[in-house]
């Protein structure tokens, strides 16, 4: 049984690519046809590529691997957060701070600062500080939570990146490639398929399409975890 059906892909609008004048020729093999000035993606290939990515993620998660979901465009922000949280993985869904992967020590300092402020609030320190200082600390906490809240529990580099629109997230992709971290990318017809290790040719601008594909990656993680739990129970 397939991980995903062509019917699901069609209903979510996964097959709609970009205007023909804004395409990347490297995506030619994933294009089915052109209609009214828009390229339509060959979703038979999308089905196959989703299965490949699903199997890779399931195997990775079964071996304790961690995945970082990345999607900062408006259409992806909600799905990235919801699905990463659903499967217990990390995410970045706001404007990325350069060096998140390549300068991991700096990221850890930011996480440490967020933890410090959270502890101050929990311990009642805010109650004895001047109001102006408390306001400043709360603003700092909100900003840190917004940008690194999804990775504050990430104690080491992820084992793979799942990226919506590698073209937009080119900094994250470049950092991952530099560190030899595998990439799974939802790649539209205006993208470079070489930028994603596991390419999923699909519409990366439709909220329903992004949600569907992101949920499948989360499902792969959950299937691996369920298998792990079943194995432990059997022992």
From Swiss-Prot:
GO terms for biological process: translation. Gene3D superfamilies: Glucose-6-phosphate isomerase like protein, domain 1, Helix hairpin bin. Pfam families: Ribosomal_S2. Keywords: Ribonucleoprotein, Ribosomal protein. GO terms for cellular component: cytosolic small ribosomal subunit. Disulfide bonds: none annotated. One of its GO terms (molecular function) is structural constituent of ribosome. InterPro entries: Ribosomal_uS2, Ribosomal_uS2_bac/mit/plastid, Ribosomal_uS2_CS, Ribosomal_uS2_flav_dom_sf. It comes from the Bacteria. NCBIfam families: rpsB_bact. Belongs to the universal ribosomal protein uS2 family. PANTHER family: 30S RIBOSOMAL PROTEIN S2 PROKARYOTIC AND ORGANELLAR, SMALL RIBOSOMAL SUBUNIT PROTEIN US2M. This is Small ribosomal subunit protein uS2. It comes from Geobacillus stearothermophilus. The lineage of its organism: Bacteria, Bacillati, Bacillota, Bacilli, Bacillales.
């Amino acid at each position: 049984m397939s991980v995903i059906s062509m019917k699901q892909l069609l209903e979510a609008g996964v097959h709609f690519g970009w205007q023909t004048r804004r395409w990347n020729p490297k995506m030619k093999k994933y294009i089915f046809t052109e209609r009214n000035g828009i390229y339509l993606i060959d979703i038979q290939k999308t089905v196959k590529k989703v299965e490949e990515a699903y199997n890779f993620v399931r195997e990775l998660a079964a071996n304790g691997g961690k995945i970082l979901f990345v999607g900062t465009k408006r259409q992806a922000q909600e799905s990235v957060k919801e699905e990463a949280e659903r499967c217990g993985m990390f995410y970045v869904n706001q404007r990325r701070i350069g060096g998140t992967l390549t300068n991991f020590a700096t990221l850890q300092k930011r996480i440490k600062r967020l933890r410090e402020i959270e502890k101050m609030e929990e311990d009642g320190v805010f109650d004895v500080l001047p109001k102006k200082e408390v306001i400043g600390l709360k603003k700092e906490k909100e900003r840190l939570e917004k940008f690194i809240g999804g990775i504050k529990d990430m104690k080491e580099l992820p084992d793979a990146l799942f990226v919506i629109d590698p073209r937009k997230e080119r900094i994250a992709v470049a950092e991952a490639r530099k560190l030899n971290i595998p990439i799974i990318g939802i790649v539209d017809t205006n993208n470079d398929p070489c930028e994603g290790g596991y390419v999923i040719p699909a519409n990366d601008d439709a909220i329903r399409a992004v949600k569907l594909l992101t949920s499948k990656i989360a499902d792969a993680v959950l299937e691996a975890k369920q298998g792990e739990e079943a194995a432990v129970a059997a022992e």
